[in-house]
Each structure stands twice: as structure tokens, then as C-alpha cells.
Amino acid sequence: LRLARNLISEGATVYVIVQDKNDGIRDDKYLECDTDEKAMGTYEMPISQKKRLRQGMQYVNQLYLKHKLEGIQNQWMISIHIDSQPEESRQDVFFYYQSESKKSKKKAKKLQEVFSEKYEKYQGRDYNGSVSSRPLFVMRASDPEPVYVELANIRNQKDRERIILPQNRQILADWLMEGFLK
């Protein structure tokens, strides 16, 4: 949501496919989980993960076609996730691109460059996030150019700090926006 707000402030048209009317941008350290999310804020979402992904991509592709017919050419699908690996597995933010898309690969590399610069400047350490293609459903099914962002490993304490501190969530959104505007 923070990235969406940032992009809107720069004039972008942004759609958040999975919405929750009572869970906006929050500054609590721990965000309560619930199950009242809706697709596009209105439509029930299937329980099955496969059906949820298909439903989400149908909306993404419908919106892409609508705006393509209006002459909008620069359209992206940004899929943001938090991984759940074994606790000892720490990871920096990493990016996937659609293997057949030069634009998707270029954008993922731009995002990685921004994160590498910021890690060196603010954390004084090398950035170990990667860029690679991966045949995930959302990457294969997306009509707009896709980028998949993996923010952290929720089971690793250091990674959790990256996403539970509100100021860190804003920093992540700021860096992602910077990468998209490059």
C-alpha cells in the first residue's frame, strides 16, 4: 500500500488487486491478520490459492487491456511477497522477472541496482539480493510487464525487522518507487 501511495503521488494509476477495507497503511509493529480481503475491494476471493491467483490475474489482465485500448503503453504488474523459508535462511530483497521479457528483466535489474546502492549507503554492507527469472504463475499469466518482489523471510528475525518496523516498510516502498522511476 505504501508503494501504491508513492506511485500515485508521482501521477501513476495504481490498482491494488487484493484489498481489505479495514486494513490500510498502518504504523503498528505487528499487523493483525484477518480474512476479509476482497478482490478489487468488492469480489469474494476463493479459498484455493490457485483460484485466487487466477482471479487476481484476470483482473490484472482486464485492466491492462482496458488501458491498452486507451493508448496507455507503460503498464506494470508488481507482485510483492514475503517468503517463509527455514528460520536460519536470511535473504535480502530479491526480484524475479518474466523470462521472455527484456523490459521485465531490465526493470528487475534497475530495482536491484537501487537496493544495492541503498544498502551500501545506509547499511554499510554488500547487498546480496538476486535477480532471476522464475516460471511462477503470476509471471507467466501477466499481460502487463511483471516484476515479482520478495521482501523478506518472515521466519528470520533480521528479515522480520525489515518488515515489522513501520519506517522500514516506508523505506522499502521508497526504494521500490525509485527503482520504478529510473
What kind of feature is each model-predicted range?
Residues 83-114:
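A short, glycine/acidic-enriched catalytic loop
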Residues 75-77, 92, 144-146:
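Extracellular structured ligand-interaction cores
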Residues 1-89, 97:
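Catalytic-core regions of hydrolytic enzymes
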Residues 4-12, 61-68, 112-121, 168, ...:
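Sec-exported extracytoplasmic/periplasmic mature domains
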Residues 83-86, 96-97, 121-182:
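Active-site-adjacent mobile loop/cap segments within catalytic or ligand-binding domains
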Residues 1-4, 53-57, 61, 92, ...:
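Extracytoplasmic/secreted envelope proteins and their assembly/folding machinery
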Residues 36-46, 65, 99-103, 144-159:
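Short, Lys/Arg-enriched charge-dense amphipathic segments
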